[in-house]
């Protein structure tokens, strides 16, 4: 049966995703940066409360995926902590200056990960040669690759997603970026066995008093009286479609 991974930005979202039928959670913070490593407090809360598999992201900052030695030191510490806390997997990705998989750094993280199932995230979509990268990640032993097919969204990337899914000899190819209730059927019809979605919405702040003219963001257009959260109805509806699809092909 196809699996649905939901990207969550905190414990509250993770609990909603679990309750709605998600098969697995990618745990991040800072959606405006595409997701960075959660704090220890969030990690502890989620590992204590959530029963389905949770894979935290190991990403020390926003921006590109070519990391300094200081960045890499933080990543090594984070993956060791996540392993020791008892998570079932983690999400990482490192490229070198030329846009290839940074094999030496990835090999070190894979060794530190121990039993963790490793997802190589959408750094894959920024690499120069996706088929070579697939071979390299297979040799490294990653469990899955999260990718949009090197396009702005996964629907546009369906041709490469199909090719990767046909060629893979190891990593599961998981479609992500712009996967929604309205287009999830296209990914299932393409034979993809894992789907990644934020399935989210903007929730209003509970604050009654709202100070005007002051912002904590460098982007003055950001509405700081909303926050991103998982939409329970959307997750449930996506799982319903996946269940119907599985029944129809069996």
UniProtKB/Swiss-Prot annotation:
* Localisation per UniProt entry: Cytoplasm
GO CC annotation, single: cytoplasm
Gene3D superfamilies, alphabetized: Copper homeostasis (CutC) domain (3.20.20.380)
User: What domain of life is recorded for the organism?
Assistant: Bacteria
Which HAMAP family does the UniProt record give? CutC
Write out the similarity annotation. Belongs to the CutC family.
Record protein name field: PF03932 family protein CutC
Provide the taxonomic classification: Bacteria, Pseudomonadati, Pseudomonadota, Gammaproteobacteria, Enterobacterales
């Amino acid at each position: 049966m196809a699996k649905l991974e939901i990207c969550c930005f905190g414990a509250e979202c993770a609990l909603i995703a679990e309750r709605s039928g998600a098969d697995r959670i990618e745990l991040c913070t800072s959606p405006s940066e595409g997701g960075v490593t959660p704090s220890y407090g969030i990690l502890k809360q989620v590992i204590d409360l959530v029963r389905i598999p949770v894979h935290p992201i190991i990403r020390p900052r926003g921006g590109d995926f070519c990391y300094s030695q200081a960045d890499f030191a933080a990543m090594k510490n984070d993956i060791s902590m996540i392993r020791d806390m008892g998570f079932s997997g983690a999400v990482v990705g490192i490229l070198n200056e030329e846009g290839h998989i940074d094999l030496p750094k990835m090999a070190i993280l894979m060794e530190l990960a121990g039993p963790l199932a490793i997802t190589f995230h959408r750094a894959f979509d920024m690499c120069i040669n996706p088929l070579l990268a697939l071979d390299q990640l297979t040799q490294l032993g990653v469990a899955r690759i999260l990718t949009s097919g090197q396009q702005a969204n996964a629907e546009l990337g369906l041709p490469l997603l199909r090719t990767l899914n046909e060629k893979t000899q190891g990593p599961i190819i998981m479609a992500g970026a712009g996967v929604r209730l309205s287009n999830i059927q296209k990914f299932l019809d393409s034979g993809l066995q894992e789907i990644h979605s934020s399935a989210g919405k903007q929730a209003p702040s509970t604050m009654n008093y709202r100070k005007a003219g002051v912002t904590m963001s460098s982007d003055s257009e950001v509405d700081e009286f909303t926050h991103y959260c998982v939409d329970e109805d959307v997750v449930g509806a996506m799982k319903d479609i996946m269940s119907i699809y599985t029944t129809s092909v069996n």
